[in-house]
Swiss-Prot record:
Catalytic activity, EC: 6.1.1.7
Cofactor: Zn(2+)
Its biological purpose: Catalyzes the attachment of alanine to tRNA(Ala) in a two-step reaction: alanine is first activated by ATP to form Ala-AMP and then transferred to the acceptor end of tRNA(Ala). Also edits incorrectly charged Ser-tRNA(Ala) and Gly-tRNA(Ala) via its editing domain.
Protein name: Alanine--tRNA ligase 2
Family, similarity comment: Belongs to the class-II aminoacyl-tRNA synthetase family.
Alphabetical list of InterPro entries matching this protein: aa-tRNA-synth_II/BPL/LPL, Ala-tRNA-lgiase_IIc, Ala-tRNA-ligase_IIc_anticod-bd, Ala-tRNA-synth_IIc_core, Ala-tRNA-synth_IIc_N, Ala-tRNA_ligase, Ala_tRNA_ligase_euk/bac, Thr/Ala-tRNA-synth_IIc_edit
Catalytic activity of the protein: tRNA(Ala) + L-alanine + ATP = L-alanyl-tRNA(Ala) + AMP + diphosphate
Binding-site residues, Zn(2+): H453, H457, C555, H559
Segments forming a coiled coil: none
GO CC entries: cytosol
GO biological process: alanyl-tRNA aminoacylation
Entry-linked PANTHER family: ALANINE--TRNA LIGASE, CYTOPLASMIC (PTHR11777:SF9), ALANYL-TRNA SYNTHETASE (PTHR11777)
Group of enzyme by EC: ligase
Length: 591
């Protein structure tokens, strides 16, 4: 069975049973600070699982792009992936356990022709608060599963939620495929890691609401949330032992082999797998509609880590030229008809890969040489201290996970706690230095710097008007002569865009607008629509400076009383500051 056939078969099957298809959401979850990426098909549906009405009804189906980063170091084995697709179906208050299991069982045995003897399932065994899930157990038995195919586990294996201290939660039943390997012992089952059982589908039943006192009550609207591992099922259906044998990885693996052969190099099978897996994940992250860029924090940090890991494996065998773009093009070609954003953002993907390669390759060789010197210094205890591991980060840009991976190849342990202490000291010094040099981004509070400070607010507002509201300030510096403003954006501004930014700022100056200031809570400021990336330093009550029609920002000040005091505004230079960050230098008219 091909990948496209499996996707289509799944969606069509559920459509025939009254489900409406919903498109894959972004890899960046909407309004969920608890996770970096969309890790399951349920992420975009959380409000509806909590009771809101979905515009497409109560039965839904999707193929969702997902990224999970907890097992990056495991990538290269037979099963672990950072990027994957999840097939999912949902019932929002309609069908429940019996119908959900019946639908799942029918799809597996009738559509995919998996013999029921190859299935194993897990069921919640019950505890002092919630009884054993007999309904699930009896439903599976009614399908012909024998007692030795049904395994009972506690909350660690067969319970979902709540996300916080209280809220929706419930039991689940996981469906496994028996790979035919011999049992590892008398207690062998789906919960062990011997490889006999591979999980392919999970049905979560949101039945209870956990109350503040720790007790549970039945929910009025009971929901079903299911997720099937697309890559795993495709591997099993085609009789392969690992996901890298499937058509999902063969095109990029073949291209990588061509490059290796052309360079007369030799690369281990694990390194090949890491590169093929990571280039797929990186291509989807860079190609996401929200355009993630490599950086040193949050999603950008994970992206940078994946890219640098690939570069390191390629450099190991002296493949010097940047082949990442060649590999990424294979992914775009392969998936572009299904996920059109990859083709739409192909140029951006290639630009970012080139930039990150150029940025890292300059220091990688020196860094690897120094890492070897540091490893030679560890002595018999085979522990790399915090000072040396921090030097690799501070001087050569090696993420700590990167250093750990290098060290493990030489059977050396990294003192991560000592590294974290050094890193914290570095951050503290950096913050103190910044406060001494430019308090609030200003070199002083003189008349000229105050005028330029107000100009940065107008510039920020104009950039968001011209380029979009996903543009955010990334830093600023003001002297007597000019302002310097850094902002998140992925490419050079066109001449027309810069001219429009200038026009908007000068329009605000000509309109002679009073600059208003109000004190309010951070919550009130956000509800007002104020922007600001430095809220944490201002406390609970903040000042919001407003230039009506042009700007609302949380800020410590100071500012001019009227925009006319700026006289005029002109950009002097627009350039790259770092990956995904642009910089504008500008001046204003003299008094």
């Amino acid at each position: 069975m091909t990948a496209n056939e499996l996707r289509k078969m799944y969606v069509d099957y559920f459509k025939e049973r009254g489900h409406q298809e919903i498109a894959s959401a972004s890899l960046l979850p909407e309004n969920d600070p608890t996770v970096l990426f969309t890790t399951a098909g349920m992420h975009p549906l959380v409000p509806y699982l909590l009771g809101e009405n979905h515009p497409k009804g109560t039965r839904l189906v999707s193929v969702q792009k997902c990224v999970r980063t907890g097992d990056i170091d495991e990538v290269g084995d037979d099963t672990h992936l950072t990027f994957f697709e999840m097939l999912g179906n949902w019932s929002l208050g309609e069908y429940f356990k019996e119908e959900s299991i019946s639908i799942s069982y029918d799809f597996l045995t009738t559509c995919l022709n998996i013999p029921k003897e190859k299935l194993a399932v897990t069921v919640f065994e019950g505890d002092e608060l919630v009884p054993r899930d007999e309904e699930v157990s009896q439903t599976w038995k009614s399908k012909g599963l024998q007692d030795n195919q049904i395994f009972y586990y506690g909350r660690e294996e067969n319970w979902w939620g709540p996300a916080g201290q209280t809220g929706p939660c419930g039991t689940d039943t996981e469906i496994f495929y028996d790979m035919g390997k011999p049992s590892c012992g008398v207690n062998c089952g789906p919960a062990c890691d011997c490889g006999k059982y591979v999980e392919i589908w999970n049905n979560v039943f949101m039945q209870y609401h956990k109350k503040p006192d720790g007790s549970y009550e039945e929910m009025k609207q009971k929901n079903v949330d299911t997720g099937m591992g697309f890559e795993r099922v495709l591997t099993i259906l085609n009789g392969y032992t690992n996901v890298y044998e499937t058509e999902l990885f063969l095109p990029v693996k073949n291209r990588l082999d061509e490059i290796i052969e052309a360079n007369e190099a030799k690369l281990s099978e694990k390194s090949k797998r890491i590169i093929c897996e990571h280039i797929r994940a990186v291509t989807f992250l860079l190609g996401d509609p929200k355009m993630i860029v490599p950086s040193n924090s949050e999603q950008g940090y994970i992206l940078r880590r994946l890219i640098r890991r690939m570069i390191r494996h390629l450099k190991q065998v002296s493949i010097e030229n940047n082949v990442l773009c060649k590999l990424s093009k294979v992914i775009v070609e392969q998936y572009g008809s299904i996920y059109v954003e990859l083709r739409e953002n192909e140029l951006f993907i290639m630009e970012q890969l080139e930039k990150e390669y150029d940025l890292f390759s300059k220091t990688l060789d020196r860094g690897l040489k120094n890492a070897k010197l540091y490893f030679d210094q560890v002595g018999e205890e085979k522990i790399l201290n915090g000072e040396l591991s921090f030097k690799l980060y501070d001087t050569f840009g090696f993420p700590i996970e990167f250093t750990i991976e290098l060290a493990s190849e030489m059977e050396i342990t990294v003192d991560v706690e000592a590294y974290n202490q050094k890193f914290a000291e570095h951050q503290k010094k950096s913050r103190q230095g910044a406060e001494v040099k430019f308090k609030g981004g200003l070199s002083d509070h003189g008349e000229q710097t105050t005028r330029l400070h107000t100009a940065t607010h107008l510039l920020n507002g104009a950039l968001r008007t011209v380029l979009g509201t996903d543009v955010f300030q990334r830093g600023s510096n003001i002297t007597e002569e000019r302002l310097r403003f850094d902002f998140s954006f992925h490419r050079k501004l066109t001449k027309e865009e810069l001219e429009e930014v200038e026009r908007i700022v000068n329009e605000a100056i000509r309109n002679q607008i009073d600059v208003l200031c109000e004190e309010m809570t951070v919550k009130e400021a956000k509800e007002l629509g104020a922007v600001g990336i430095f809220e944490d330093k201002y406390g609970e009550v903040v000042k919001v400076y407003m230039i009506p029609g042009y700007s609302k920002e949380i800020c410590g000040g100071p500012h001019v009383k009227n925009t006319s005091e700026l006289k005029s505004f002109r950009t002097v230079k627009e350039e790259a500051s770092s990956a995904g960050v642009r910089r504008i230098k500008a001046v204003i008219g003299s008094n």
